[in-house]
């Protein structure tokens, strides 16, 4: 493969996210979607639409047919599929989390490091322009030093979501590993390293073995404190996906789910509505505020990640 040739790609797992990866790769000039791997025979139709081949098992894909892989399978499969990709010398992007346990994740990362092959993790929201702008505002102290943040991720997943994949009712299929991990990555990117975490979880909404809600308190090394309310069992307008419209599976609301507080102002995220003193002074609780919204380009960060 020359540097100008498109990257021959296999997408492993064609569920909610895998289908999006496949469609983005099909329309991307730098990629040649070669294979879709999924045990569901109905995915053959999708492969035909995207002008690629389908296989029920990764073992049926010749090693020489691809240069890279995207793994979008259930969490417990990330390690075995990742090691198979490694054995075939494929650069690999694995959907978050990198694996279902810390030990499995360390095994996969170590194996790729020893081989000198790229292993990427799909934290695609860092490619959203609102992240870049928020990071710029915090880094430059445009609103003064960062003090605190409050995050909500609250949606109601339909029953069909759980019926489509039994693994979503197991210990590695709850909103902490599937959904909160995105918020955690954004917090690390914006607020820096973590010093301390306290949390409580509950499964009282569905009564299953996996959590359906959580409350989390995070202290960062900088002294910043953040609170998180998380649930996949409550109907609400508050989620990054709803606010940004980045995920076609989740209805857009346009309502930001984060509040970020600084000494001279605060802002909502990802919508970037900024609140400051109405007169442009330092301000305090006795003075009126003004607000303005910073506009950013409307993009699909999953596509930008490629």
Show the residue positions of the predicted features.
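Beta-loop-alpha module in the N-terminal Rossmann-like domain of NAD(P)-dependent dehydrogenases
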Residues: 21, 39, 52-111
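Rossmann-fold dehydrogenase core element
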Residues: 107-125, 144-151
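N-terminal Rossmann-like dinucleotide-binding module
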Residues: 1-50
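Core-facing hydrophobic residues within beta-strands of well-ordered domains
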Residues: 31-33, 66, 146, 194
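Predominantly a Rossmann-like dinucleotide-binding segment in NAD(P)-dependent oxidoreductases
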Residues: 125-209, 214-218
């Amino acid at each position: 493969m020359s540097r100008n040739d498109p990257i021959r790609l296999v997408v492993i797992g064609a569920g909610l996210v895998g289908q999006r990866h496949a469609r983005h790769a099909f329309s991307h000039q730098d990629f040649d979607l070669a294979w879709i791997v999924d045990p569901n025979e109905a995915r053959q139709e999708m492969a035909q639409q995207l002008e690629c081949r389908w296989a029920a098992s990764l073992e049926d894909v010749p090693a020489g047919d691809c240069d890279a892989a995207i793994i979008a399978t259930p969490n417990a499969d990330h390690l075995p599929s990742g090691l198979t990709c490694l054995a075939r010398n494929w650069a690999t992007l694995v959907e978050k989390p990198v694996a279902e346990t810390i030990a499995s994740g360390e095994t996969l990362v170590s194996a790729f490091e020893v081989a000198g092959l790229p292993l990427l993790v799909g934290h695609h929201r860092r490619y959203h322009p609102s992240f870049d702008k928020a990071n710029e505002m915090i880094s430059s102290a445009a609103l003064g030093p960062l003090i605190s943040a409050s995050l909500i991720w609250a949606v109601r997943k339909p029953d069909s979501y759980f019926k489509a994949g039994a693994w979503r009712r197991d210990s590695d299929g709850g909103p902490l590993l599937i959904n909160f991990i995105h918020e955690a990555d954004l917090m690390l990117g914006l607020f820096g390293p973590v010093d301390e975490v306290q949390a409580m979880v509950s499964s009282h909404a569905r009564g299953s073995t996996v959590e359906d809600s959580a409350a989390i308190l995070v202290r960062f090394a900088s002294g910043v404190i953040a609170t998180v309310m998380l649930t996949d069992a409550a109907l609400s307008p508050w989620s990054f996906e709803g606010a940004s419209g980045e995920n076609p599976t989740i209805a857009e609301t346009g309502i930001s789910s984060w509040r970020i507080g600084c000494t001279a102002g605060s802002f909502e995220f990802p919508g970037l509505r900024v609140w400051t003193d109405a007169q442009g002074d330092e301000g305090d609780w006795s003075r009126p505020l003004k607000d303005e919204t910073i506009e950013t380009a409307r993009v699909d960060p999953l596509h930008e990640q490629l």
